[in-house]
Amino acid sequence: MKLKNIVNYLKEVGIDVELKGDDSINVDQVSGLVEAQQNHISFLSDSKRIHELETTSAGVVLIHPKFESLTTTTCLLVENPYFAFAKVSQLLNPENFPAGIHASAVVDDSAKIAESAWIGENVVIGKRVTIGDNCYIGPGSVVLDDSVIGQKTRLVANVTVMHNCIIGEEGYLDPGCVIGGQGFGFANEQGEWHKIPQIGRVVIGDRVFVGVNANIHRGAINDTVIESNCIIDSLVHIAHNVSIGYGSAIASQVGFAGSTAVGKYCVFAGQAGINGHISIADKSYFAAKSGVTHTIKESGSYSGFPAIPTPEWQKNMVRSKGLNKMAQKIKHLEKELQELKSKLEND
C-alpha cells in the first residue's frame, strides 16, 4: 500500500498527521523498530527507545513531532504514535470473512441472521437469536435462546453466549470465554446448599474486548453490565450483578465478587481481587495483586492488601524492609530497660 493512502486513511479516522518524506513508499506491514524492514511502518512512543530509532531499517516511522529532528527516515508526525500505529495495523491486517452459514451449523428457524454475517463450522444458534450485520460467529461457538449479537462483533471460536444476553456492536470475544454463565448464588439451610435461579442477564456495550477463557456471570435478579469501550483480559472472572464502567481495563486473573459497582476509566492490574457489594470511584487504578476489600470513594492509585493509596503503601514497604533491624533494636532496648529497672530496684 502506498504511504499516501495510509496518510489519507489516518485523516479519515480523525488523526492529525503530517508527512515528512516520500509519500510514494510502499508499506506492506507494521513492525517494531528493531525488527522492521524497508517495507514496514513502525513507531516511537517512548524516549527510552530513541536508540532504536537511530538504527531502524523501517521505511516509515510514526513519531511525535518533538522527535522529528532525531531521524532522517520518512516519518508521520502524530500526537499519539501508538494509537496511530494501532489504526495502521488495523488497515494493513483486515479481518475478512465470507458471508453465509456453514453446512455443519445448527441454526434455529426463528433466529434472525443478517445476510452479511458468517456462521461458522459446528456453531449452534438458539431460538429467537439475533445476529447483526457483518458479525463473525466462529467455529464451535454457541449462542443460546433470545440473545442478541450486535453488528461487526466477532466471536472467534468456541465462545459461549448463554440465553438472553446482549452483546453490543464491534465487540471481540476470544476463544473459550463464557458470557452469561450461572452466578454463584446459593442459600444455606441447615448445612445444605440450595441453588438460586439466576434470572438476570449479561448486557455488554459496544467495542468491548473479552479475552481467552474469561467468564462473565449473569445477574441473580439484576443484570451484570459491562459498559462500552472496556477491555477484559484472559482468565478474568466477573461475578453476578457486577457493573463495570465505561472505558475500564482489566488485566489477566482479576476477580470480581458479586454486586460490585466499578466506575468509569478504572484500571485493574493482574491478579487484583475485588470484594463484593462495594463501589469503586471513577479513574481508580489498582496495582497487581491488590486486595480491594472496601469501597473506594476517591479516584487515585491503590496498592497492597488491603488496598491503600499507593504512596502510603510504598512508605510501608520501605519500612517493612527494616522490620528485622527494628525488632532487634526493640529487643536490645527492652534488655537495657530491664537492666535499668533492676538496678533502680536494687538501689
UniProtKB/Swiss-Prot annotation:
Name of the protein in question: UDP-3-O-acylglucosamine N-acyltransferase
- Annotated function: Catalyzes the N-acylation of UDP-3-O-acylglucosamine using 3-hydroxyacyl-ACP as the acyl donor. Is involved in the biosynthesis of lipid A, a phosphorylated glycolipid that anchors the lipopolysaccharide to the outer membrane of the cell.
> What InterPro entries has UniProt attached to this entry?
Hexapep, LpxD, Trimer_LpxA-like_sf, UDP_GlcNAc_AcTrfase_non-rep
- Active site residues according to the UniProt entry: H240 (proton acceptor)
GO function terms (MF aspect): N-acyltransferase activity
Homology family: Belongs to the transferase hexapeptide repeat family. LpxD subfamily.
What Enzyme Commission number(s) appear in the record?
Answer: 2.3.1.191
* KW Acyltransferase (keyword) present: yes
User: What top-level branch of life does the organism fall under?
Assistant: Bacteria
Matching entries from NCBIfam families are given as: lipid_A_lpxD, PRK00892.1
Reactions listed under catalytic activity: a UDP-3-O-[(3R)-3-hydroxyacyl]-alpha-D-glucosamine + a (3R)-hydroxyacyl-[ACP] = a UDP-2-N,3-O-bis[(3R)-3-hydroxyacyl]-alpha-D-glucosamine + holo-[ACP] + H(+)
Q: In which pathway does it act?
A: Bacterial outer membrane biogenesis; LPS lipid A biosynthesis
Share what the entry says about its subunit structure, partners included: Homotrimer.
Q: Does the keyword Lipid metabolism apply?
A: yes
Q: Which UniProt keywords apply?
A: Acyltransferase, Lipid A biosynthesis, Lipid biosynthesis, Lipid metabolism, Repeat, Transferase
Q: Which gene encodes it?
A: lpxD
GO biological-process terms attached to the record: lipid A biosynthetic process
GO CC annotation:
membrane
Q: Name one Pfam family in it.
A: Hexapep
Recorded hits in HAMAP family, A to Z, give: LpxD
